Amino acid sequence: MTVSHRNDQKLISAKELARLSDVSYAAINNYTDMGLLDVVARRRRLRLYDEAVAKERLMMIVRLISEGYTLRIINKIVRGDGHAQNL
């Protein structure tokens, strides 16, 4: 489910984000619960993400995982507690 939002922001559900990014729905939910992905709106029981921001963030998460970083370290990088500018 893709929805238009203010400022031409396209919102996307976790299910659709998983389908488009080839990342499992469970992983999307886990990353959200950890604070790696930001929910920008809610519609009933759906958590909606900014499509462009979420896709970019997921690409970074997948890349960092493939480079051997743990989710704990990735969380620090995403939150600005790490050295993201050097990655």
Where are the regions a protein language model picked out?
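Arg/Lys-rich, alpha-helical DNA-contact motif
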Residues: 1-19, 25, 29, 33-34, ...
